[in-house]
């Protein structure tokens, strides 16, 4: 009623992220799954990614934010209830996250946004020592045929516009801001993320893609633990 609907358009289902298979959810029926900083609290993180992949339609997406560490967290810190409750000691090592995501079937994980977490509390800082943490918003697509590296097939896209909130510039990830009406060269993986998903109606493709030109230049993922430009963003305190 508050949003002007005559009948409810939302269904709430109680369950556990690690046990989505126990819920009455149809495999391959979801266009989009969203999660906000809760996967790090799950004890069986690979199960979460496997279940999400199973539930998504081909071309579907897991869009989520979470906290990651620049190394594997020692077992004694994982057991610390304060650190765990602060979403720190349950954080996946960044390299393990990428391996877990790809093992679940999500090729070429993308970073949408990231910022380092500044540990300001003296007691927490003493416990974590030199471990660095980052808050990352990521997107994972359920797509067949994504390659291990970004490959150049001489193709580009033109953004037509029309995505709500991104009328002038479409942000796929931290490395791809696509201006409306401009020819934008893309690698094969990025092309698939645009043309084999719900975004396809908003793009035109330039090039047949029948010739390989080697690695696509400048398509490396960002260092999520690197210092950020303080003029434009800031680290989140803990």
Please give the residue ranges for each predicted region.
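Short, glycine-/aromatic-enriched active-site segment of Class I SAM-dependent methyltransferases
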Residues: 68-88
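A short SAM/SAH-binding and catalytic strip from SAM-dependent methyltransferases
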Residues: 18, 31-44
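A short glycine-rich, Lys/Arg-flanked "PGG" loop and its adjoining helix->strand segment in the class I
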Residues: 46-61
């Amino acid at each position: 009623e508050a949003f002007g609907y005559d009948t409810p358009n939302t269904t709430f289902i109680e369950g556990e992220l690690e046990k989505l298979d126990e819920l009455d959810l149809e495999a391959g029926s979801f266009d989009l799954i969203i999660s906000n900083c809760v996967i790090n609290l799950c004890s069986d993180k690979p199960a979460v990614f496997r279940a999400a992949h199973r539930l998504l339609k081909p071309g579907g997406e897991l869009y989520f934010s979470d906290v990651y560490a620049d190394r594997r967290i020692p077992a004694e810190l994982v057991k610390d209830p304060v650190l765990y409750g602060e979403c720190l000691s349950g954080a996946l090592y960044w390299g393990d996250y990428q391996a877990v995501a790809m093992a679940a079937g999500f090729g070429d994980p993308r970073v949408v946004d990231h910022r380092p977490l500044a540990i300001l509390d003296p007691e927490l800082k003493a416990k974590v020592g030199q471990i660095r943490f980052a808050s990352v918003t990521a997107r994972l697509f359920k797509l067949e045929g994504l390659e291990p590296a970004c490959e150049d097939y001489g193709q580009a896209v033109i953004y037509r516009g029309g995505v709500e909130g991104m009328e002038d510039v479409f942000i796929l990830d931290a490395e791809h801001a696509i201006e409306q009406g401009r020819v934008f060269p893309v690698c094969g993986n990025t092309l698939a993320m645009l043309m084999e998903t719900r975004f396809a109606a908003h793009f035109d493709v330039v090039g047949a893609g029948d010739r390989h030109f080697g690695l696509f230049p400048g398509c490396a993922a960002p260092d999520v633990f690197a210092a950020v430009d303080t003029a434009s963003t800031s680290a989140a305190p803990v």
